[in-house]
């Protein structure tokens, strides 16, 4: 069973159903229980914050409540909350200078949890050699 770390953007794009093919396939597998998608709580909070502010994602305006989005992602959805414990923090402080605050936590979680890849659009993560999935 594959395991992946998702960033906030991928969660938002999932909510508006506009994921690119490979990322959509992974989320579909997770919905079927065949793959695990994890996201640090901060990535989930960023996505829920965007829902609360009716942010536009890929030309689609987010509607609904943060609670409905939480249910769609975690409650009844394909995403689980990745722990942020000492191991993640140890990895975070080692890489924080190479990334912004959000990307550093995504990469640290990916490393600590040993996931197969990161579901993200971020070019900075891709350019540093971490396995990413988007297209």
Which ranges hold each PLM region?
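Short amphipathic alpha-helical segments and helix-helix/interface helices
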Residues: 24-28, 70-71, 106-107, 122
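Alpha-helix capping/helix-boundary segments
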Residues: 10, 43, 88, 105-106, ...
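Structured helix-beta-strand junction loops
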Residues: 33-34, 76-77, 128
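Active-site-proximal, substrate-binding regions of enzyme catalytic domains
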Residues: 24, 42-44, 48-80, 86-90
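Histidine- and aromatic-rich ligand-binding microenvironments
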Residues: 6-7, 13, 39-40, 99-101, ...
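Short, well-structured N-terminal submotif of metal-dependent ribonuclease cores
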Residues: 1-39, 54-64, 113
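Acidic, PIN/NYN-like endoribonuclease modules and their adjacent C-terminal/linker elements
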Residues: 1-3, 107-135
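Active-site neighborhoods of divalent-metal-dependent phosphate/nucleic-acid chemistry enzymes
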Residues: 78-116, 121
């Amino acid at each position: 069973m594959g395991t992946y770390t998702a960033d906030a953007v991928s969660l938002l794009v999932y909510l508006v159903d506009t994921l690119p093919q490979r990322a959509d396939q992974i989320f579909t597998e997770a919905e079927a229980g065949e793959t695990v998608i994890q996201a640090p709580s901060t990535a989930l909070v960023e996505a829920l914050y965007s829902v609360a502010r009716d942010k536009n994602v890929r030309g689609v305006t987010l509607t609904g409540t943060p609670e409905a989005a939480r249910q769609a992602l975690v409650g009844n959805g394909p995403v689980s909350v990745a722990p942020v414990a000492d191991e993640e923090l140890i990895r975070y402080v080692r890489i924080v200078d190479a990334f912004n605050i959000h990307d550093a936590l995504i990469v640290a979680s990916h490393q600590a949890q040993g996931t197969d890849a990161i579901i993200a659009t971020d070019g900075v993560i891709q350019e540093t050699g971490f396995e990413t999935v988007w297209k």
